[in-house]
A protein has these predicted regions:
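Short coil-to-beta strand junction motifs in C2/discoidin
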Residues: 101-102, 117-134
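Aromatic- and Gly/Pro-enriched, solvent-exposed loop/edge beta-strand patches characteristic
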Residues: 130-131, 135-196
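Secretory targeting signatures
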Residues: 1-29, 236-268
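Short glycine-rich beta-strand segments
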Residues: 107-114, 137-141
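Proprotein-processing/basic-patch segments
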Residues: 25-43, 48-49, 54-59, 64-96, ...
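Long, compositionally biased, intrinsically disordered regions
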Residues: 35-36, 124-129, 141, 259-268
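Solvent-exposed loop and beta-edge segments used for protein-protein assembly and interaction
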Residues: 79-83, 99-105, 126-128, 155, ...
């Protein structure tokens, strides 16, 4: 009977002893990381344009499909240039992101324009112009919009803004919350010429730098990269909740006690 008790105790000890899992990764090659996705130490979303009608964004500062000049530009002698760029992340966001509450989402862009873009001024806008607006979207939800008042035409301007993350904005649920940067502006030109001899007025133009010169930095918290967060487990279980191993161990102890107390009955 004493032998049975010893076996039960040994079983308990085995259950309570942590087992070191083997390194299965040694025999498997890890998939190559997509640098267009966010990662630890890489939290900046960059914008790109092919110079035609396609714009996109991702977390790599360069893209071979973007314009070689790293800049997009539109010109018009007479009339309105209506800018509406939607830099949606491509490829789509694969991981869940946990932003630091109280941290700042920071935008940094370089914009150029010529012509008039202010209604009600001394220019030629009559309700058909608009200031520069840069809007950050979390999927379909608008997170923040920055409006920049007009500056002296014919000059580049570094546009910098920030937004403090709230609890409601903290968790970005991968594909459902794919980030988008939207840039809108309306500038108007009134240049006219008389058979190419007499030229009057000013042409309209819009320019925007891309890649490293056009980005949004996110305060991605380190907890983002944990397996629990990626699995949707955002809070650890309460400390007083017994784990599975503890339950099994308790059962084994009870078995040992039962066997030991049964000894007198067996002797009879």
């Amino acid at each position: 009977m004493r032998g049975k008790t010893i076996v039960a105790i040994v079983l308990v000890a085995m259950l309570l002893t942590p087992v070191q899992a083997g390194d299965v990764s040694a025999s498997q090659s890890e998939p190559e990381e997509d640098t267009r996705q966010p990662s630890k130490g890489n939290a900046s979303l960059f914008v790109f344009h092919d110079g035609l009608n396609n714009e996109w964004s991702h977390f790599n500062s360069s893209d071979e499909d973007s314009t070689e000049e790293n800049e997009t530009r539109e010109d018009k002698d007479n009339g309105v240039i209506d800018i509406k760029y939607r830099f949606m992340m491509k490829p789509t966001l694969e991981k869940r992101l946990n932003m630091t509450v109280g941290g700042e989402i920071r935008g940094n862009f370089n914009i150029y324009y010529e012509g008039d873009n202010e209604d009600g001024g001394n220019g030629n806008c009559n309700g058909d112009c608009d200031w520069l607006n840069i809007t950050i979207f979390k999927g379909a939800a608008e997170i923040h919009q920055h409006t920049e008042q007009p500056w002296i035409a014919g000059n580049w301007k570094n546009i910098v803004f920030s937004y403090i993350v709230t609890e409601e904005d903290a968790v970005w649920d991968s594909t459902n919350d794919n980030p988008i940067v939207e840039v809108t502006m309306k500038v108007k030109g009134d240049r006219t010429s008389d058979f190419g001899v007499l030229v009057s007025g000013n042409a309209a133009a819009f320019g925007m730098q891309l890649g490293a010169n056009g980005q949004v930095e996110f305060p991605i918290d380190d907890s983002t990269w944990s397996e629990d967060f990626q699995a949707g487990i955002e809070e650890a279980p309460p400390e007083d909740t017994p784990g599975f191993t503890l339950v099994i161990a308790s059962a084994a102890i009870a078995m040992a006690v039962f066997i030991n107390t049964k000894k007198p009955e067996d002797d009879e």
